[in-house]
């Protein structure tokens, strides 16, 4: 008996979450087990950038990771969730540059390199602390003593080791090649950092005079060249036509005179040219266009760089051969008038000069995509610069084979094709960046320009026998952030040392990440890991066995979340709530585009007129889990969040009903389990099976569905109600059976739900465990429920499902006839099968209590029923006498609706059976089943029509 047990009326997340998490962390529950005989399970978190704070995408992916970690911990595995943060070179440097500009009016150059880097370390301490606190608030079960940062000493050593080894193997080299150059930030940037923006531009058609008296097929002494970038024409080193374009075949190998620069350049043939674009003649500028660069390499054209690193026109062209070395034998003068001009000013001047010379043929409007640096915010410039590169083709071959052979699985599988498409056409990777924040490239130069690569300067001098007085200067550049991120799964475990952790937890089991970084991070992790980490047999290790690819979290209108749109949702605001004023300040304060503030404020007030209420971490986690459909983008849904907050309350209230019920009897003695007790155990087992199967397939949404369906619809709405009459009127043995089942199923349900909703389940479990006779300090170290085939009870399921349909049918008759629950009804039954008859006899008392019936009677064969409202449950006819209750008009309308429904089903089956293709292909058993269904509907329709006629005659 539990008369003295107390439990709060409602669950208040803010009252328990942070205290519970502190207890978990201090108790060391998140740490891997020291029992190395246990199977290991590990996940390396995609390290968030230390640029600010976590967003909803982080919360989404981390919730899914934590579900897997908590599940495997409860399965008895030795679990490690390796966490940490990424230094995020360019992004973090820009954040701090903006900060000191806004607060101090200074630039990084005012500080100097060392002092500015100290400022970034200060920022990292602040931002990294914010991120780790947010992750705690999400309930992430992380061993915080293992938290790493991509510029930790150990990880920095790993970066140097990889660089030096790859250089020694000839896979890292320095060369002059074309890169995405940000002329504002003065650094090379990756393709990921380039945003192609739709733009209304122009297609200029210029006349390039043919040299040496050559003529076109139609007698012209010039070629018309179409270009969208006139400012680069001073760097042209050829014009190209398609080899099969008959208009120009006779000119291939001849030359044109490059206007303004007055030098001859060849006419070449290349398949790259689109005969339908413009005039079918294009200028080739290998130093200023990626496609032209490839054409130039194929034809061994010189590369004429006419721009400075500021994207101004140079005073003197830089001329590079196709081998990447300075070319002394080629001359390309830049006219004085363009020298020093900003690139777009030069564009206008060049167009004007072509027009003045009579060489501007026409200008056509042209829609094009202009590449912008996503952080600098200006058009990027393809630029020839000296950079460090990784020759990745040898690494890529092994990485492709790992996925082909199934060593690494992508979920959903379609993302394998994305991976293959990039990896099979992979280009050398530019790994150097002209920044101050990041891993400094471990290369040193003497005054003659000789390059020495080693782990540190002392090693350089020892390795090359350099005298102590020889001046050496370290390379100023830093490595691309993705270089160090690519080592994440093994560098965090102590590599290059062969540590016990590396042996125990590598390869990791799963990577959960977004599709947008498959190329830039996932692929590079696979390449680096398989090159550097081998098992005891020398076989390359994969970094992870599965890559689970998520979609993006978008706002409720399907828009991508961004600060400029003012639609970013902070996961902590969903957890703790936030008033409207604070939300407006968060969304419109310190904006880079303050002109958008008013628009954002209006949209925010419309979406959240009262601010955001507290929902708690569990409701947020359950919402994210329920929305996690495979691979698709997800529209955030506040109504779902509110619904799952109600779900938390439902679980709390159900637990409170069970634990504070003064009729609960857990005393020793004989026990009798009812059909309902057996049914709920069976249903619970099916839920365990559904959850486990869904999780094995990364169908997190189906895990949430299984939990919700069982908890709300089966346990709360049905089983609790079915136990109430037993606890009041049952025998002592029946009361014990119901009481034990309530406690047993509730305790197991808490364990089943724990990986998704850790806080509320821990809180309730501590109240339940004494009743359940369970010991332990925390639910997270309890065993996860197993599916038990023997606990399935088909008879109990069939009986309770029939009983539920009967109760629902009676309740529907009440609702449709406006009969209040306080008025007792009689129920007459006809045409019962033997199974129906047994279900009735076994559950008569429960049916009467649940449906609020005065009496239940089975009609004798041939016995006429009084005027009644009828419902069908399978073939059984349910009749509720309506004397004194019936609303004739409403009942006829209801029957008419039922008749139409049955007629529709009959018509649907008739159409199917009339379809010759269906009949020809369907197995005979399927056709027979359809005919049987149609006969059932016909019989039911006949009964409904009789009922209709009887009521109509009143």
UniProtKB/Swiss-Prot annotation:
Any Pfam family the entry gives: tRNA-synt_1
Primary location group: cytoplasm
Domain of life of the organism encoding this protein: Bacteria
Coiled coil: 883-953
Main function: Catalyzes the attachment of valine to tRNA(Val). As ValRS can inadvertently accommodate and process structurally similar amino acids such as threonine, to avoid such errors, it has a 'posttransfer' editing activity that hydrolyzes mischarged Thr-tRNA(Val) in a tRNA-dependent manner.
Protein name: Valine--tRNA ligase
Reactions accelerated catalytically: tRNA(Val) + L-valine + ATP = L-valyl-tRNA(Val) + AMP + diphosphate
Subcellular location as annotated: Cytoplasm
Molecular function in Gene Ontology: aminoacyl-tRNA deacylase activity; ATP binding; valine-tRNA ligase activity
Keyword annotations: Aminoacyl-tRNA synthetase, ATP-binding, Coiled coil, Cytoplasm, Ligase, Nucleotide-binding, Protein biosynthesis
PANTHER family xrefs: VALINE--TRNA LIGASE, CHLOROPLASTIC_MITOCHONDRIAL 2, VALYL-TRNA SYNTHETASES
Written domain comment of the UniProt record: ValRS has two distinct active sites: one for aminoacylation and one for editing. The misactivated threonine is translocated from the active site to the editing site. The C-terminal coiled-coil domain is crucial for aminoacylation activity.
Subunit structure as annotated in this protein's UniProt entry: Monomer.
Biological classification of the source: Bacteria, Pseudomonadati, Pseudomonadota, Gammaproteobacteria, Pasteurellales
UniProt keyword annotation of Disulfide bond present: no
EC number of this enzyme: 6.1.1.9
Family annotation (SUPFAM superfamilies): Anticodon-binding domain of a subclass of class I aminoacyl-tRNA synthetases, Nucleotidylyl transferase, tRNA-binding arm, ValRS/IleRS/LeuRS editing domain
Protein's gene: valS
């Amino acid at each position: 008996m539990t008369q003295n047990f107390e439990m709060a009326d409602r669950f208040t997340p803010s009252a328990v979450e942070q205290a519970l998490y502190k207890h978990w962390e201090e108790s060391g529950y998140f740490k891997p087990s020291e029992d190395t005989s246990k199977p290991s399970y590990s996940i390396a978190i995609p390290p968030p950038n230390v640029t600010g704070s976590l967003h909803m995408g982080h919360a989404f992916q981390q919730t899914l990771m934590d579900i897997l970690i908590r599940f495997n911990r409860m399965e008895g595995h030795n679990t490690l969730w390796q966490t940490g943060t990424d230094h995020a070179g360019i992004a973090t440097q820009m954040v701090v540059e903006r900060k000191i500009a806004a607060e101090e009016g200074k630039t990084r150059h005012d500080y100097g390199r060392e002092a500015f880097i100290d400022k970034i370390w200060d920022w990292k301490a602040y931002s990294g602390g914010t991120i780790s606190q947010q992750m705690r608030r999400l309930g992430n079960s992380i061993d915080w003593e293992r938290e790493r940062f991509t510029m930790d000493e150990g990880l920095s050593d790993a970066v140097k080791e990889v660089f030096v080894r790859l250089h020694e193997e000839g896979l890292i080299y320095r060369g002059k090649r074309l890169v995405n150059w940000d002329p504002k930030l003065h650094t090379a940037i990756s393709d990921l950092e380039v945003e192609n923006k739709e733009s209304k531009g122009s297609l200029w058609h210029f006349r390039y005079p043919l040299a040496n008296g050559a003529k076109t097929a139609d007698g012209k002494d010039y070629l018309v060249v179409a270009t969208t970038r006139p400012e680069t024409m001073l760097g042209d080193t050829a014009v190209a036509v398609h080899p099969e374009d008959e208009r120009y075949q006779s000119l291939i190998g001849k030359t044109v005179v490059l206007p303004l620069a007055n030098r001859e350049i060849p006419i070449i043939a290349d398949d790259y040219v689109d005969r339908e674009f413009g005039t079918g003649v294009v200028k080739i500028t290998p130093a200023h266009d990626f496609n032209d660069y490839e054409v130039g390499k194929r034809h061994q054209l010189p590369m004429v760089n006419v721009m400075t690193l500021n994207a101004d026109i140079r005073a003197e062209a830089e001329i590079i051969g196709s081998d990447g070395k300075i070319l002394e034998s080629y001359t390309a003068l830049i006219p004085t008038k363009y020298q020093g001009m900003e690139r777009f000013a030069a564009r206008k001047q060049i167009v004007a000069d072509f027009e003045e010379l009579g060489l501007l043929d026409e200008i056509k409007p042209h829609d094009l995509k202009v590449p912008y640096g996503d952080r600098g915010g200006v058009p990027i410039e393809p630029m020839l610069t000296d950079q460090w590169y990784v020759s990745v083709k040898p690494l890529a071959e092994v990485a492709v084979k790992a996925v082909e052979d199934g060593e690494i699985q992508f979920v959903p599988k379609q993302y394998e094709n994305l991976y293959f498409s990039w990896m099979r056409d992979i280009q050398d990777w530019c790994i150097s960046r002209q920044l101050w924040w990041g891993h400094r490239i471990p290369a040193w130069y003497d005054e003659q320009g000789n390059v020495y690569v080693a782990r540190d300067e002392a090693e350089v001098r020892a390795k090359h026998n350099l005298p102590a007085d020889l001046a050496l200067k370290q390379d100023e550049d830093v490595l691309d952030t993705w270089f160090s991120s690519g080592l994440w799964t093994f560098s965090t475990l102590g590599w290059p040392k062969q540590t016990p952790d590396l042996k125990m937890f590598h390869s990791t089991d799963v990577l959960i990440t977004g599709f947008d970084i498959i190329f830039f991070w996932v692929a590079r992790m696979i390449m680096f890991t398989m090159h550097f980490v081998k098992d005891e047999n020398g076989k390359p290790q994969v970094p992870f066995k599965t890559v689970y690819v998520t979609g993006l979290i978008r706002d409720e209108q399907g828009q991508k979340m961004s600060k400029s749109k003012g639609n970013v949702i902070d996961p902590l605001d969903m957890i703790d709530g936030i008033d409207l004023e604070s939300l407006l300040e968060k969304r419109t304060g310190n904006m880079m585009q303050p002109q958008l503030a008013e628009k954002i404020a209006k949209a925010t007030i419309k979406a959240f007129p009262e601010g955001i209420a507290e929902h708690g971490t569990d409701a947020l986690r359950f919402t994210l889990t329920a929305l996690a459909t495979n691979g698709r983008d997800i529209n955030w849904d506040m109504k779902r969040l509110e619904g799952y907050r109600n779900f938390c309350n439902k679980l709390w209230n159900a637990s409170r009903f069970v634990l504070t019920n003064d009729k609960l009897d857990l005393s020793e003695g004989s026990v009798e389990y009812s059909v309902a007790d057996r049914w709920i155990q069976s249903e619970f087992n099916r839920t365990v099976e559904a959850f486990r199967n869904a999780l094995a397939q990364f169908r997190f949404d189906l895990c949430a569905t299984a939990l919700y369906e069982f908890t709300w619809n089966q346990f709360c709405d049905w089983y609790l109600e079915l136990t109430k009459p037993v606890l009041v009127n049952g025998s002592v043995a029946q009361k014990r059976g119901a009481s034990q089942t309530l406690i047993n199923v509730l305790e197991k349900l808490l364990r089943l739900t724990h990986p998704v909703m850790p806080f509320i389940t821990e809180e309730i479990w501590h109240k339940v465990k004494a009743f359940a006779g369970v010991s332990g300090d925390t639910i997270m170290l309890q065993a996860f429920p197993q599916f038990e085939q023997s606990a399935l009870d088909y008879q109990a399921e069939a009986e309770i499902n029939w009983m539920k349909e009967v109760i629902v049918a009676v309740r529907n008759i009440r609702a449709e006839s406006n009969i209040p629950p306080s008025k007792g009804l009689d129920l007459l039954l006809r045409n019962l099968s033997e199974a129906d008859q047994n279900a009735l006899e076994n559950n008569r008392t429960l049916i009467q209590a649940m449906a609020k019936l005065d009496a239940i009677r089975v009609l004798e064969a041939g016995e006429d029923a009084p005027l009644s409202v009828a419902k069908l449950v399978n073939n059984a006819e349910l009749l509720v006498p309506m004397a004194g209750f019936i609303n004739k008009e409403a009942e006829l309308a209801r029957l008419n609706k039922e008749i139409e429904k049955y007629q529709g089903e009959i018509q649907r089956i008739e159409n199917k059976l009339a379809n010759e293709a269906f009949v020809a292909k369907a197995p005979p058993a399927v056709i027979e089943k359809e005919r049987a269904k149609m006969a059932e509907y016909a019989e039911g329709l006949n009964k409904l029509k009789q009922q209709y006629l009887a009521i109509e005659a009143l």
